[in-house]
Amino acid sequence: MMNKKIFSLVFSMVFAATSASCLTACKDSGGLDAFPEYADDKQMMIGGWDSPMNTLEDYRMAKEMGLTHIFIDEYFAPKGSQDYKDILGFCEEVGLKAIVNMGASVDSEKPTDTTDYSIYPAVDMINYWDEPTIDRFELIKELANEHEARYKDKRDMTFYINMDPSGGGGDPDEYVRTFCEEIMPLVSGRKILSTDVYPLSGKNGAHSVSSAWLPRLELNAVYAKEFDMEQHFFVQSYWSNLTGTREIYSIDDLRYQFYVDMAYGVQNFSYFTYTHSFIEGFGGGCVEREVSCKKTALYDWAQEINAELAKFDHVYLSFDWNGTMPIVGTDNPDGENAHFMALKHSLTALECANKVTATQDTLVGQFKDADGNDGLIVTNYTDPLDLVDDVVSFEFKNANRALVYRGGERKIYEVKNGKLDIRLAPGEGVFVIPVKLK
């Protein structure tokens, strides 16, 4: 494992190089002739865990919610059965991409399914293991080699592992680095670093945000950047007293998770769960488990957010993450945030702004596109149940306009003397592109 001093040095060098290129772009060059435009040729992955009932109508309903992918388990049909093959056919018919679950999790044994799933057009990924312990990595290397041999001369088939958020029984840094260094080079094609932290905590009327969330987002963001991997994070759409996760009360609880994750550059998401979980004591999900095509309250909320993201995902995905700046709000009576203090690689300033302040605790993710334009994900970090608006104030170095994507819609704001104030509702985030026009 790289020791922490070397790790920090590498991370700093990456950001220093980025900063140098940005400073050139940010200096006054007379301004742009027009606002930057982005080709609508990129799509955010929005998946769902726990497959629905095995009817065409149920899979069409998943697609209509805005899902691009669905994890296929064996709750309703065992692998190899005609019912299972029918499910893959349903996915193909409605335009959903299937992620085949191999069933291995934590410290279980190596899965034995050797089916060639490339013959099923809907199958896009193979999920070989969920939250493996670090002592399973040798088995996962075997799976990676077998996957590469099976699919390398056929069509693209993504090798997928969902990592344990607590470090697989070891040090989290070592766990993630070992995966990136020793396992992912064994496979070709799309490479994804995935994990899950379910941040909305509480029971018996109390509520809080998990302190484990931001450190894991930061860790994955740093390694994904270093190893040129995409990120994937699960969104909490379930609750259980068994796990200390609270109920999802409104659309704000879902939107909040997306924008906090996006402040750390996450490009792909999945709902845990899409279907009401079969695990005893778990609530939530977007559809019921035992009744065909029956929505829960979360379905419409998720559908709205998915549509919101789809309106500007091609813009967001045209930018690369270059760090995150946490801001303690001026109205925070403690003057500090323990979640922010646990972070190791936070930015202390933005490249495109002389100053930024906020009334509430805020995250600002810093991004750059291929032409050197700056982008910022700005997120109200307060728990949505606190019902607190946040006013974020920027003093940009070189901007007279700002493109602000709010609710998925692009709005143009005038930036006077470099200053822009943005009010964020509870759970809200926006994507900001500061621009100087001639």
Model-assigned labels for residue ranges:
Residues 4-6, 28, 418:
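N-terminal cationic leader/targeting segments used for protein routing and processing
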Residues 1-11:
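Bacterial N-terminal signal peptides that target proteins for export
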Residues 2-3, 25, 404, 408:
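Intrinsically disordered, low-complexity sequence elements enriched in Ser/Thr/Gly/Pro
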Residues 10-21:
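Bacterial N-terminal signal peptides
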Residues 19-34:
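Bacterial Sec-dependent N-terminal signal peptides
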Residues 30-401, 405-438:
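Glycan-processing catalytic domains of CAZymes
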